Amino acid sequence: LGDVYKRQAENYTLDDELSYLIDNREMWFIPVINPDGYVYNELIEPDGGGMHRKNRRNTNCGNGTTRGVDLNRNFGFECGADNIGSSSDPCSEVYRGDSPFSEPETEAVRDFILNHDFKNVLHYHSYSNLYIHAFGDGSYPEEPDLTTHREIGLEMARHNGYYVGTGLDGIGYT
């Protein structure tokens, strides 16, 4: 996301579309949802490329990469449904936690979302190098929203080659 901020600052007066968006829209960025996992990645992969996905909550699975809760699996929507894409095993890489929003990080994101009336959301999923757009249930937004989601994601991906699509399209489950 650092490139997004930098582009906004450097191109504000040069890009009419960008200037319009900044002047007439609210944009919110949450650059890191998993600060403990982020710091742990820096420790285990100081040159970058760390792919530790869990926070650092003690789940009695040692002190390595099996420790913690996968925050992407700890949100409320169909959390743990059919055990697809997540696990109830605390030592699993995709452990979803004891219950939806059991982690302070996901609770904070939930509360932030509930306190804002978002019209659009683009999810930057750094673990898999994805830009995930609506919807997360396997369906697609109606036009022109689908095209808008894809155009925004493709413009961002032009700078880093990330995949753009829904969670179902990108990783095979939602």
Predicted regions: what is each one?
Residues 18, 34, 67, 71:
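Glycine-rich, flexible loop/turn motifs
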Residues 40-42, 133-134:
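Short, well-ordered secondary-structure micro-motifs
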Residues 20-41:
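Short, conserved secondary-structure transition motifs
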Residues 47-174:
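Metallocarboxypeptidase
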Residues 6-9, 30, 110:
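Short, well-ordered alpha-helical packing segments
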Residues 10, 35-38, 77-80:
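Alpha-helix capping at helix-to-loop junctions
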Residues 6-23, 76:
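Flexible, small-residue-rich helix->loop connector segments that border functional cores
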Residues 1-5:
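Short, small-residue-biased leader/transition segments that mark boundaries at the very start
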